[in-house]
């Protein structure tokens, strides 16, 4: 497998890995940090911002080992794929969805779908845990619809029941 293909595979595999990590860590023992993301923002930075720092350090370690091993080490393209996923997540999640930096709203089907899925996650503190290809469980979509909530326009991070449901 070429390095480019390996990097692309790593990028794609990161979506289910991220979903599992989000469910197990962010909404598990890491909820102390992650809770700040489900509450109204009080500062430019939130405790939840420590997660990408920790994950970036892990990726830097993988890339460093790949460079140290040299030769045909698969760690470098894997590290590049993981880094590409992390950069995509940062731009889509923090910039486009949460608008933590000035950025125009994205008005297309993909942006609409990503915002709607992420809003459901913030509303109920449950799935979808993935991000670039989220699947909203039917029961949660129906629950939001039954409450008359426009899942695409909800202000993210202000739901009163965001982590209690």
Predicted regions and their residues:
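Hydrophobic transmembrane helical bundles of multi-pass organellar membrane proteins
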Residues: 1-165
């Amino acid at each position: 497998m070429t390095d480019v293909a390996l990097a692309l595979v790593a990028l794609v595999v990161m979506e289910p890995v991220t979903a599992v990590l989000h469910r197990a860590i962010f909404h598990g023992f890491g909820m102390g940090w992650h809770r700040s993301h489900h509450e109204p923002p009080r500062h430019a930075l939130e405790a939840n911002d420590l997660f990408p720092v920790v994950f970036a350090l892990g990726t830097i370690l993988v890339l460093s080992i790949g460079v140290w091993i040299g030769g045909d080490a698969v760690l470098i393209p894997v590290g590049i794929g993981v880094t590409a996923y992390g950069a995509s997540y940062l731009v889509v999640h923090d910039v486009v969805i949460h608008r933590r930096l000035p950025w125009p709203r994205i008005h297309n089907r993909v942006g609409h779908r990503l915002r709607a899925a992420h809003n459901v996650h913030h509303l109920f503190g449950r799935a979808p845990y993935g991000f670039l290809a989220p699947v909203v469980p039917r029961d949660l979509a129906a629950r939001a619809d039954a409450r008359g909530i426009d899942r695409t326009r909800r202000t993210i991070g202000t739901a009163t029941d965001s982590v209690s449901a």
